[in-house]
Regions:
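Sec-dependent N-terminal signal peptides
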Residues: 1-6
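All-alpha RGS (Regulator of G-protein Signaling) helical domain and cognate RGS-like helical scaffolds
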Residues: 15-193
Length: 193
């Protein structure tokens, strides 16, 4: 399904270039280091929430979306950890993405979903801004990062999570009367151009 296609795309997009120069120097900068260090815990929390959705979701469509999130973000996590290790071994100092924690969507605790009365709406309310934060982080990487693999991943994050935001907003209108994902910017739902 979509999860398999997205996973195949991620594997294909993340393979190939080793981002080393002719002397074996790592082609990365402080933005790349900041991106990996911020995106790893960001993805970990999304994976935790999606994993919880597999057992708590009331609607099969949300469970399917959560399964897709798990597949794609688990693959991305493996790549992020590998690239982070290479960047750290190269001694590249961490820069700054230029985003606040709120802008990165990191103020959400998946543990809060465990006891949510209306799980599906609570999941949507948490994950839409969380995904918007991932898109902002990916755009910051594209703007200033130089690591080719991370730049490809950022493009994929923008596309995949933009799609997922649109799906969750549709679910929100159907199941939550538009209250769960309301007030969030459409411009953060994927590519703007």
């Amino acid at each position: 399904m979509l999860a398999a296609a997205l996973a195949a795309l991620m594997i294909a997009a993340c393979g190939g270039d080793d981002d080393s120069g002719p002397t074996g120097d790592v082609r990365a900068n402080g933005t790349d280091a900041a991106f990996t260090n911020a995106m790893i815990p960001h993805h970990e929390s999304a994976v935790d929430a999606a994993d919880l959705a597999l057992s708590r979701a009331e609607h099969g469509q949300l469970e399917e979306l959560a399964r897709e999130m798990l597949t794609v973000q688990s693959t991305e996590l493996a790549t992020l950890r590998s690239v982070r290790d290479v960047i750290q071994q190269a001694g590249i100092e961490q820069g700054d993405l230029g985003l606040s924690e709120e802008e990165m969507g990191v103020g959400h605790d998946p543990a809060e979903l465990r006891n949510a009365q209306d799980f599906d709406c609570a999941f949507i309310e948490m994950m839409v801004p969380h995904h918007e934060g991932a898109i902002r982080m990916a755009r910051a990487e594209l703007e200033s990062g130089i690591h080719a693999e991370l730049r490809r991943m950022s493009e994929n994050i923008i596309d995949a999570q933009g799609y997922e935001i649109r799906q969750m907003r549709r679910f929100d209108r159907r199941w939550c009367d538009g209250r769960a994902a309301g007030g969030h910017s459409e411009s953060d739902a994927g590519h703007s151009g």
